[in-house]
Each structure stands twice: as C-alpha cells, then as structure tokens.
C-alpha cells in the first residue's frame, strides 16, 4: 500500500479554501482522499468544500485545530487505510510536484515526517518581509537542521507523516503550536527522521496588517517557549535540546542588543552607527539574494521598512519570554488571519 491522504482543518475559510482544494486536486490527489474538517464554520466553508466532492467532517462547534485533529485521529481509520497522511492549512496552495516529492521522501527507510518549503504569497510590504524570513529560514537553517537531524518544527501548512507515526502523536491542547509539539514528540519518542525537502513547495497567506502580524508572532514565540518548558528542553542534552537552546538563546541575545541600540547610540554613537550600517548591509544583501532566488522584486523594494519589523520581532520575542517563562502566564486560543 502506498496511498496518501490530505487532512485540511478549516474554520471560516470561504475566501481561500477553493484555491487550496483546487491546487490539491490538480496535484494528483483523488477527491476521496481529501478530508476537510469544518471546525464550526459559519460562512459556508463546509458547503464549498463539499462542492468539490471531497470528504467533509463537520464539528458542531469550533474546537480548534489540535482538538479537531485529535478527534479525527481517534474516530477515523485513516492510519489503517493510508500509508502517508499530509496536513495542510486552508490557505495553502501546493505545487504540482508536492505530493510526488513527499511520497518519495517518506518512502525512504527511517523517515517519519517530511516538511516542505513555504513561500509567502505576495500582497504588500509585510508579506514581502515574511517572504524574506521564510527564505532565510529554509535556505540557511532548514537544510542544516535536516542534515543534522534537529528540525525543530514541521510547519502546519506543509507537514506529512507516515501513517503509523501520525497515529502515535498526541494532539495536545496544552500548547498553542501543535505543529512544533508534534515535531518534538517525534524526536523524544525516536519515531524516525524528520527531513526537509525544498521541492515540496507550498504557497501560504501570511498576515498583511501589523496587528495580525504581531498576534501571529506572539503566538509562535509563546508556543515555542511553552514547548521548551513542557519537554524540559532548557536542561536537556539531546541534539534537539541543544538546537532549541541555540535558537532561542540567539533570539534573546539579538533581541536585547537590537533594542538597546538607542543606549549604544548615547554611549558611543560611532559604534552604534557601525552596527546599524553592518546590519542594514547584511539585510539588504539577503533581500537581494531572496529577490533573485524567488523572483520577488517586492522583497528588495520593501527592504527599507524591514528595520521596523525587526524591532517588532525583537520586542514580541522578549515580551513572550517574559510572560511565558518568567511570569508563567498561561496563553490559550487562536485567532484567524485576515485572508485576501
């Protein structure tokens, strides 16, 4: 058996779910192998999905992505009927080669999960910055993490699992980043390798307003700190623990240094100026490389505004650390990014 299915949780996604389903079907997946979880939508999302002839599982009320997946895993026989299970977000459009690449990767011995490469759909200067952030993450970090076996998160918009691995995952609701939670579970339980494949390409809609961007970054960062505390990664000594500490520690150090620029400027204006000039030059170079690689001229044109977003990134990262790790505040819930 070498069958593959797609599971697509959706809540009020009438604007984008048609494009998502069309791309999945155009990539070669049969209608009978697509499962949409209509999580209490009130905008006709389930009806739109049903019009494509796919399977629609309806929740009478909104219970969230993690609980929806948990419920589906408990009541369905998907792990028995399929070899591979792919998770998608309702704003994701897959490339025509996506599922072929995923099947080949999951068919290798010892591979438990595959994460694809996400690209931000062009819309405005903020999505151009997210395009750059994704490019840096996938071009610099993900390949190295894959080779060393320390991928920290398989993104929810492009994650695929062996069915027997999917069946063993706990879709917990005690953290707000179910994709990272499941990734660390695979490492902790030694369920197999997690590999990154850049040809498993998807396009996703990212926040187009600063308000939505800040909310999303706060959720991601808070969730990452929650994962560290849940799995004892601050004091762990495995490879994934060290990678986690390296990434989060880097974020803390850079965040503090970046936000202290006004202080450095008051103490030593010349040193502060050199630091800003060097940082801007590196960011401009990366923007140019990303613009060429992804054929996104908007990434380069919007680069003068990236300093503002980096200030926001650092502020939100440190704020989430303070709330989650220092004050131990419990954060739950999710919000919907405005679609376009």
Where are the predicted features?
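Acidic helix N-cap motif at the loop->helix transition within catalytic regions
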Residues: 15-19, 43-51, 97
């Amino acid at each position: 058996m070498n069958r593959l299915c797609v599971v697509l949780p959706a809540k009020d996604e009438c604007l984008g779910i048609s494009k998502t389903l069309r791309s999945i079907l155009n990539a070669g997946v049969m209608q009978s192998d697509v499962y949409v979880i209509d999580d209490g939508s009130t905008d006709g999302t389930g009806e739109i999905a049903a019009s494509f002839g796919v399977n629609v599982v309806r929740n009478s009320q909104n219970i969230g992505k993690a609980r929806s997946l948990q419920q589906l895993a408990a009541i369905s026989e998907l792990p028995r009927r399929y070899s591979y299970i792919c998770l998608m977000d309702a704003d994701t459009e897959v490339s025509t080669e996506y599922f072929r690449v995923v099947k080949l990767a999951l068919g290798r011995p010892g591979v438990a999960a595959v994460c694809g490469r996400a690209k931000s759909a062009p819309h405005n200067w903020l999505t151009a910055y997210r395009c750059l952030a994704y490019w840096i993450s996938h071009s610099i970090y993900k390949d190295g993490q894959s080779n060393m076996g320390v991928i920290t998160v398989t993104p929810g918009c492009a994650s695929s699992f062996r069915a027997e691995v999917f069946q063993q995952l706990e879709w917990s609701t005690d953290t707000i980043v179910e994709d990272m939670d499941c990734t660390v579970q695979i490492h902790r339980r030694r369920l197999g390798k997690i590999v990154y494949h850049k040809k498993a390409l998807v396009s996703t809609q990212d926040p187009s307003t600063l308000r939505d961007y800040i909310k999303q970054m706060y959720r991601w960062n808070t969730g990452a700190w929650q994962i560290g505390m849940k799995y004892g990664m601050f004091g762990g000594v495995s490879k994934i623990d060290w990678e986690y500490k390296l990434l989060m520690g880097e974020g803390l150090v850079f965040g503090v240094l970046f936000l202290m620029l006004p202080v450095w400027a008051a103490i030593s204006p010349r040193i502060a100026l050199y630091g800003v000039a060097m940082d801007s030059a590196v960011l401009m170079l990366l923007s140019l490389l990303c613009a060429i690689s992804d054929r996104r001229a908007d990434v380069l044109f919007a680069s003068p505004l990236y300093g503002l977003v980096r200030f926001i990134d650092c502020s939100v990262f440190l704020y989430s650390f303070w709330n989650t790790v220092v004050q131990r505040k419990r954060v739950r819930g999710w919000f919907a990014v405005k679609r376009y």
